[in-house]
A protein has these predicted regions:
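Active-site cofactor/cluster-binding pocket
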Residues: 1-254
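Thiamine diphosphate
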Residues: 10-98, 245, 250, 258, ...
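Short glycine-rich or small-residue beta-strand-to-loop segments that form or flank ligand, phosphate
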Residues: 11-18, 168-170, 258-261, 308-311, ...
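A glycine-rich phosphate-binding loop feature that marks nucleotide/adenosyl-phosphate handling sites
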Residues: 47-48, 187, 204, 225-229, ...
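Short gly/pro/ser/thr-enriched loop/turn and capping motifs at secondary-structure boundaries
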Residues: 48-52, 111-115, 145, 292-294, ...
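Gly-rich Lys/Arg/Thr-decorated short loops/hinges at beta-loop-alpha junctions or inter-strand turns
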Residues: 50, 148-150, 217-232, 250-257, ...
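Conserved thiamine diphosphate
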Residues: 132-135, 139-143, 351-404, 424-435, ...
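Flexible, low-complexity linker and terminal segments
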Residues: 237-246, 254, 389-610
């Protein structure tokens, strides 16, 4: 049948179903196909913490939201244009995110009485009960159609049913005029060792596409044209993958081999897994028995001359705190990547937050200041990791890089850079010295000490957690301790001399300055433009460098009457700013729900104080 093709600037699709319905893969494949087609994209995987949550329950719903556009896309979108609900629980959990004009695709085979009741409905009519009967509802027997498509495939019934996500993906590909070839290529690569599965998956994908083209419920299809991008080679990249590659780039630029000692933890494990793939680039990885062993092996590797890395999330950062103090007092280069998740304790492992900031800044015994930087988007994780490595090695100090589950698991198009565009990394390595070696003698500008590797004659020195003097001799002298504490703090403070100036986006004479840090950038930036479109005078100051702050921070704040600090915690950055720059007043907008901001929340918060 004929369908009207409508051009649109952008569209948001939300796939949701049981944890075993393959929604993460479905969303990823749609995002990858759109990225390869040339669209701007932003993704938001949202899944339960349980390995297999209870079947058919709201708590067990797994979702994946994709925002594609022909222009700039900075968030996964607040509300969706298309909602795919593979069962009643998925519809119940996600109907609130469907726009009034949304299309809702329902697998009618799963909407039986038992599953409707299990999802907590009061009636047997979920659509009416949820008040979405005025949406464009596409009732499709997806499970039955999948079985029919693959009845001659030779696969067992359980394996066939698992393919219903591919049928659904085919329907969505038709609705948005996505080419099938990219996904065909993925299937050929994924099932290279199981070739019998390639053609059945291709067939069910095509049959879903063909089915959608022949039903009256889909009256229109949509085209999102490729975005206008700078010339170059692009790929879709997740935050965790970008972090790993940025660390490898820092290793290459410094000439120091990369060593990563880590313990698997959600949502940071993918960084260790990605690094382990690249042994051909001189990367060494160790999956340690626990968090403490992971960081301690990394410190040992740093002492031996490696660019040392350890990765973790909030609970692991707590366990690593004593060893972080060891890295700080020995003044060895180390990058600790904390992919933040909901806490405290185990918390909600698969949900995102920014609640580790205070721990990163202060969570150690003694006077133990550590440099803290943050990534603001999945692709920016590359630059953030690269510069964290540069600062760690050039200034001989541990650096904490804060990312978030939202960034680590999320993805967006990334223009693959040329390493010629990145600065050299020049660690203060010493091969020989005249006279007695002073391991804690400092560069007069940066206050960094020299990096002396074991085995160099005349450069032997002690390291360890006990206080030392400049000569590296253990000392409990009060005056020496005060001197060393002050020098280590001064070294971190002087890092500000090497940071770029903080930038402000928006009106210089704005009524409100929105302040954020880390992974909230896309939502704050989009909110800024929506407010400007309303005629409001607003500006955005988003921080990638936390400790130390950029040197011009106070000059920026002095220009604005109202400063609104927005963050996914109870106000940790606002409290830090009050301590560092108490001459200014700070308003707050906070969210601690294990979910990222939605743009409307920020717009409403700013309008409330204008």
């Amino acid at each position: 049948m004929q369908h009207k093709v409508i051009d649109t600037q952008d569209v948001v699709i939300r796939f949701c179903g049981d944890s075993g319905d393959g929604m993460q893969l479905t969303g990823t494949l749609f995002a990858d196909a759109s990225a390869l087609y040339g669209n701007e994209i932003s993704t938001f995987p949202d899944y339960p913490a349980e390995i297999r949550a209870p079947h058919g329950t709201v708590s067990g719903v797994s979702g994946f939201q994709v925002h594609i556009g022909s222009g700039e896309v900075n968030t996964p979108g607040d509300f969706c244009d298309v909602l795919v609900a593979m069962n009643p629980a998925a519809l119940r959990a996600n109907a609130k995110w469907a726009k009034p004009t949304a299309t809702v695709i329902i697998d009618t085979d799963t909407f039986d009485e038992a599953l409707i009741k299990r999802a907590g409905y009061a009636t047997l009519d979920p659509v009416t009960e949820l008040g979405i009967e005025d949406r464009n509802i596409i009732y499709s027997p997806i499970t039955t159609l999948t079985k029919e498509s693959l009845k001659d495939s030779g696969m067992d019934q359980k394996a066939i049913v698992r393919c219903k996500n591919m049928f659904t993906l085919g329907m969505c590909f038709f609705m948005f005029n996505r080419p099938l070839e990219y996904t065909y290529a993925y299937l050929e690569k994924k099932f290279k060792k199981k070739p019998a599965l390639i053609e059945p998956n291709k067939k069910v994908l095509f049959d879903g596409f063909n089915y959608a083209s022949n039903i009256q419920a889909i009256a229109n299809t949509y085209t999102v044209k490729p975005a206008k991008q700078e010339k170059g080679v692009y790929r879709n990249i997740s935050g965790n993958q970008a972090t790993a590659w940025g660390l490898i780039a820092a290793s290459e630029k410094s000439g120091r081999p990369l060593f990563c000692g880590s313990y698997p933890i959600t949502p940071a494990t993918a960084i260790l897994e990605e690094l382990a793939i690249h042994k051909n680039l001189g990367v060494k990885t160790l999956q340690a028995e626990d968090e403490i062993a992971g960081i301690c092996t990394a410190i040992g590797a740093a002492y031996a001359g490696n660019f040392a890395v350890t990765t973790t999330s909030g609970p692991g950062l707590s366990l690593k705190s004593e060893a972080l103090g060891l890295a700080m007092i020995t003044e060895l280069p180390l990058v600790l990547v904390d992919v933040q998740r909901s806490g405290p304790s185990t918390g909600i492992p698969t949900k995102t937050e920014q609640t580790d900031l205070a721990q990163a800044l202060y969570g150690r015994n003694g006077e133990c200041p550590i440099a803290v930087v943050a990534a603001h988007s999945p692709s920016h994780c590359f630059d953030a990791a690269f510069y964290a490595g540069k600062y760690a090695m050039e200034h001989m100090m541990p650096v904490i890089l804060l990312t978030e589950g939202f960034l680590g698991n999320g993805s967006e198009p990334w223009k693959i850079p040329s390493m010629k565009d990145y600065p050299a990394i020049k660690p203060p390595i010493i091969d020989k010295c005249e006279g007695a070696f002073q391991p804690f003698a400092r560069d007069p500008k940066s206050f960094a000490r020299k990096w002396a590797f074991p085995g160099k004659a005349g450069l032997e020195h002690r390291v360890g957690g006990l206080e030392k003097n400049t000569a590296g001799v253990i000392s409990s002298d009060p005056e020496n301790h005060a001197k060393m504490v002050a020098e280590r703090a001064e070294k971190v403070a002087r890092l500000a001399n090497y940071l770029p100036e903080q930038e402000v986006i928006g009106d210089k004479d704005a009524d409100v300055l929105i302040v954020g840090w880390g992974g909230t950038f896309g939502h704050l930036y989009t909110a800024l433009h929506e407010l400007q479109d309303e005629g409001k005078k607003v500006a955005l100051c988003h921080f990638d460098f936390i400790n130390p702050l950029p040197k011009n921070t106070a000059d920026i704040f002095a220009r604005y009457k109202k400063i609104l600090v927005c963050e996914l915690n109870s106000g940790q950055f606002a409290d830090y700013l009050r301590a560092k720059l108490p001459q200014f007043s700070y308003l707050q907008y906070n969210k601690v729900q294990g979910q990222p901001f939605i743009v409307k929340e920020i717009v409403d918060a700013v309008n409330a104080i204008l």
